[in-house]
Amino acid sequence: MNARPITDADIEAVAAMAAEDEAALQGRPSRLGANDVRDWLARVDLAQDSWLYEEDGTLVAMSWFDFIDDLGFFAGIVAQGAKGRGLGSRIVATGDARARERGAARVQTFGLEQDTAAASLFERHGFAFVRRFFAMAIELEAPPVVPALPDAFTLETFRLEDARPYYEALDAAFQDHWEHHTVGFEQWWEAKQAVHDFDPTLWFLIRDGDEIAAVIRNDPDRNGGGYVGAIGVQRAWRGKGLGRALLLRTFAEFYSRGVPRVTLGVDAESPTGATKLYESVGMTTENAGVVYEKALA
């Protein structure tokens, strides 16, 4: 069996394999596409930390590894027709070894909640459940009404000159988020501009005077529709309806572009009550994913 790094030319095939696997697990068609795979691999050094497994020229599995601070993370997919042949164990062993090489104190991986075979595999290799995340979505049937804000607040579209204060507001809002890692403005901004379909006309913010109180960052095409990549309200401004206003502004923008479907991912145990907010604007849970962790120190 041949293993080699993933290249841009492989993205469509990997997306098709991932969609087939997800559909089999959740019992309905998957909306995963090439842009979702590009997001998974956005921070990955493909030459060093990605693996595409082929047998007689046929794609049978893929995996990748990422590292930040003291944390290693890997994930992978085995094609439906190649399960039960040890590829999952090979992916886990490769991710574990790569994390140790990088000096990680711990390593995490991820699987859909329905994937009991993956859960058993991870547990056999010393991983334990640590967190659950929900994938939520809304299918808009009419343009949403964006609520008026109190006089002190203004809702605006992002401008390039807003980049640094926008980042600072987002980073501050995410201090409550599980496993948040501050990467610094330059690294964050470079990464965002490098996204192949970077579209800051889909980013919005709310000001309170000269201060940015809340922000939302959206991507045009993920999981079969528009995607909320991040939304954050700084602590001092929570409970004022700012998150709701940003979501409805986002929905209205996507609807005006002919995109009625919008999705996002959320920590099921978010201390800010994010799940309730998303439900209040009409979003429902489509599936759940589970993060597993293993200590290496």
Report each predicted region and the residues it spans.
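Conserved acetyl-CoA-binding loop-helix of GNAT-fold acetyltransferases
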Residues: 84-97, 230-233, 239-256, 275-280
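Short amphipathic alpha-helix that is part of the acyltransferase structural core
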Residues: 1-39, 148-181
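Active-site proximal loops enriched in glycine and acidic residues that flank catalytic Cys/His/Asp
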Residues: 208, 216-222, 230-235, 251, ...
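A short, internal acetyl-CoA/4′-phosphopantetheine-binding micro-motif in the GNAT/acyltransferase core
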Residues: 52, 75-85, 231-238, 268
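Active-site/acyl-donor-binding loops of N-acyltransferases
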Residues: 124-144, 248, 257-297
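N-terminal charged segments
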Residues: 4-75, 96
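Acyl-donor-binding surface of acyltransferase catalytic domains
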Residues: 66-73, 78-152, 290-294
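A conserved beta-strand-loop-helix scaffold within acyl/acetyltransferase catalytic domains
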Residues: 26-49, 63-70, 177-233
